[in-house]
Amino acid sequence: VTSQLFHAIPAQLNSNASRYQVSSVIEDSRVERLQEQIAILKDSMTTNIAYHANDPSAGLAQHISTEQFKLFCADTGLFVTLAFWDEGFTSNTIYQKLLSDKLRADIGYVYENIVAQILTASGRKLYYHTWPTEKGNRNYEVDFILSREGKICPIEVKSSQSKEHVSIDA
């Protein structure tokens, strides 16, 4: 079960869901029943967990939802290997195309994983925030939220030339 949760990290991030959806990885499962496996992943230091901050204000840790989280790989090279697992082995061609921005795939989730790895390596806890749009048919999301000197600092990760940041403007 722990292995299934780990191997699904790239697919879960690529799905653009507002959280890691355990039930789509392990049928009929809920986060509450898999707390031990999630703790194993966290303690193994192969994953980084970003918790949903229900109230994006100073003291983020006081306002988290332990049932709403995103999992990231602690090592982006390992993340890329998992994302392209169907290759038999992740060829150097994939890495070369990735590094030269010529990989024909939506790889925004790879950049999110890179930012998660950098923030964690710098000693930061990971938090993100979502809230419904005015119409309520989808959610806005701020990819990462930091608390610095009593102020909230949103981080929006972009993988393209797009300069729009709808979530931050909302």
Show where each model-derived region lies:
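Accessory nucleic acid-recognition modules appended to NTPase machines
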Residues: 1-151
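Active-site-adjacent loop/helix micro-motif of nuclease/hydrolase catalytic cores
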Residues: 128, 137, 161-169
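Short conserved micro-motifs at the rims of enzyme active sites and ligand-binding pockets
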Residues: 83-86, 156-157, 166-167
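Active-site ExK catalytic segment of metal-dependent nucleases
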Residues: 147-162
